[in-house]
């Protein structure tokens, strides 16, 4: 008689994805972040669901409904801070996951990689529309500035912005539709994550050496379920420390003031996880040029499979490319810092140099380094 998990139609799917899945025996802790992203998504959907039960998407009551959640709802303060800081945690895991994909050459699984880029764009869209909902001062002005960027699109720009706003400014209609988008998008992300896994399991996982590991694969359970469980516990410890001891550390003080369209904050900026893209946007003095650079800062990732010149897949044995990779990481941290600074010297020139370096490393220096390393190894 066959074991139920191998014969039952539903159990069979779970079995092939999480139990009997053949996995490389040498994947490191950097491979934990895929499962951690799944955990973050579940956490965000659950906390978001409970917040939606008490939130009202109306400009007159949105701010006070969030206050009501924190003051009057049982553990409302905890749910709210878990949801707000859960977004930061989500993006930390997401950026590490993408960084690991670049370092170990996982982008050569083109279908999986492209679905991943789509997931990144959807997650950024979800975070942006969710950011507006509490209707604080920076939330309101952030929404106004970022949506207004679409007016740079020739011919249809202004109409497109007014269509998104539902009027001539960010108002009740905007808040209502942003709430609707924020509610539905995580479920689309969850469905796409399934497709992401489906494509990954077609090819099997990559490994730190970047070489085929078909001859020595091990079952996913119990080896990697245990490893993922350990990663989840460590992540939750970090998360709860942030939520319970420093809940407002990553937020903006301006958001404790209700939105006021007559009073502009001195320095408008998005959440920390968008600052690198915001710095690239600001580094170009032209509005349309800035919007194009902003879009390319994410879409450039889609070119990586076609810019791979090395005969080796991973960066594990390529010191020149490793140096460039860590330069890219340092550059992104620099851009994140610059995005939070006012638009004045010396921050302007630092942002412009860092933005140019970001594209230069990805589009030119890393492919060149791959060719040089091939030459050095006489390949």
Swiss-Prot record:
Q: What else is known?
A: Heme 1 (or BL or b562) is low-potential and absorbs at about 562 nm, and heme 2 (or BH or b566) is high-potential and absorbs at about 566 nm.
Residues bound to a ubiquinone are 201
Asked if the record carries the keyword Signal, the reply is: no
What GO molecular-function term can you cite, just one? ubiquinol-cytochrome-c reductase activity
**Name of the protein this chain belongs to:** Cytochrome b
Family recorded in the similarity comment: Belongs to the cytochrome b family.
SUPFAM superfamilies hit by this protein: a domain/subunit of cytochrome bc1 complex (Ubiquinol-cytochrome c reductase), Transmembrane di-heme cytochromes
Subunit relationships: The cytochrome bc1 complex contains 11 subunits: 3 respiratory subunits (MT-CYB, CYC1 and UQCRFS1), 2 core proteins (UQCRC1 and UQCRC2) and 6 low-molecular weight proteins (UQCRH/QCR6, UQCRB/QCR7, UQCRQ/QCR8, UQCR10/QCR9, UQCR11/QCR10 and a cleavage product of UQCRFS1). This cytochrome bc1 complex then forms a dimer.
Cofactor(s) named in the record = heme b
Membrane topology is: Multi-pass membrane protein
Binding of heme b b566 occurs at 97, 196
Keywords assigned = Electron transport, Heme, Iron, Membrane, Metal-binding, Mitochondrion, Mitochondrion inner membrane, Respiratory chain, Transmembrane, Transmembrane helix, Transport, Ubiquinone
The record ties this protein, via PROSITE patterns, to: CYTB_CTER, CYTB_NTER
Q: What task does this protein carry out?
A: Component of the ubiquinol-cytochrome c reductase complex (complex III or cytochrome b-c1 complex) that is part of the mitochondrial respiratory chain. The b-c1 complex mediates electron transfer from ubiquinol to cytochrome c. Contributes to the generation of a proton gradient across the mitochondrial membrane that is then used for ATP synthesis.
Keyword GTP-binding: yes or no?
A: no
Cellular component per GO, a single term? mitochondrial inner membrane
Q: Where in the cell is it found?
A: Mitochondrion inner membrane
Which biological process, per GO, is one annotated for this protein? mitochondrial electron transport, ubiquinol to cytochrome c
- What does the record's cofactor remark say about binding? Binds 2 heme b groups non-covalently.
